[in-house]
């Protein structure tokens, strides 16, 4: 059973997440608006904000579940172009987050021989240089992800969102886990999500929609639906765009070919 974790100390690089005034990296959120946890289990209280040292993303991290409940990126055309110009191949640097205590964080051993990938929430491919890429490899930016989903559909969704950001100029992208039913754990420590979401908000048009995927192997791990921010709040208990009025965003259909169509489907997971 999960019990509430008491956080006794907060470092300069991680703070209890309560409001925009408390944020250590307000520029990562649209208009500085921090997500609000509306209806969580008691054990989800005390999310820790973990700002990437070199910018680019911020994680809202649960020291109880030992996964981020979301990662937020301010994804820009300039960053994508810089990545394409500078990237010379991925260098894996998976490591525990030393901003957290052992009791609060996931360790490499938690994932060993688990059958799950260490799935990035803020993707390494969204980084623009070696330092920002290195930032993405802390385990506080990971969830246990089914390999078929992580390496195929989810990767294609990431690519589709980059394509849209390059086309539109800038987006705010929220990625995280969904927990439905009885939650399973790696070594009784790291929560395994039943699904993965990626919410995309265009600040220019005030449009937003989310991809929702099954976190499983096989054909079910290759299916997704598109939902509204309100439906995502129902599923996660988190209001990602509090006070922001949005219209549906026409999300691109993820494809492995590099060419992206568009989907106007808005269904439910």
Annotate each language-model stretch with its function:
Residues 4-15:
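Bacterial N-terminal signal peptides
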Residues 16-269:
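Domain-level detector for secreted/extracellular nuclease and nuclease-toxin modules, and
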């Amino acid at each position: 059973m999960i019990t509430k974790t008491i956080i006794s100390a907060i470092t300069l690089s991680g703070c209890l997440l309560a409001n925009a005034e408390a944020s250590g990296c307000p520029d990562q959120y649209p208009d500085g608006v921090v997500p609000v946890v509306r209806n969580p289990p008691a054990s989800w209280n005390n999310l820790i904000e973990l700002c990437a040292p070199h910018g680019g993303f911020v994680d809202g991290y649960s020291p109880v579940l030992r996964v981020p409940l979301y990662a937020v990126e301010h994804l820009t055309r300039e960053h994508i172009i810089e990545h394409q110009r500078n990237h010379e191949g991925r260098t894996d640097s998976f490591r525990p987050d030393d901003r957290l205590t052992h009791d609060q964080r996931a360790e490499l051993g938690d994932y060993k021989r688990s059958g799950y990938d260490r799935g990035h929430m803020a993707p390494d491919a969204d980084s623009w240089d070696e330092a920002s890429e290195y930032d993405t490899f802390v385990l506080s930016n990971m969830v246990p992800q089914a390999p078929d989903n992580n390496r195929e559909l989810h990767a294609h969704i990431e690519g589709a969102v980059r394509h849209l950001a390059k086309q539109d100029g800038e987006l705010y992208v929220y990625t995280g886990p969904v927990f439905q039913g009885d939650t399973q754990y790696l070594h009784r420590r790291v929560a395994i999500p039943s699904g993965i979401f990626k919410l995309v908000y265009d600040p220019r048009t005030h449009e937003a929609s989310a991809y929702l995927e099954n976190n499983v192997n096989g054909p079910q791990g290759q299916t997704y639906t598109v939902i509204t921010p309100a439906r995502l709040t129902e599923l996660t208990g988190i209001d990602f765009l509090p006070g922001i009025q949005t219209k549906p965003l026409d999300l691109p259909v993820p494809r492995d070919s590099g060419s992206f169509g568009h989907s106007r489907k808005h269904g439910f997971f």
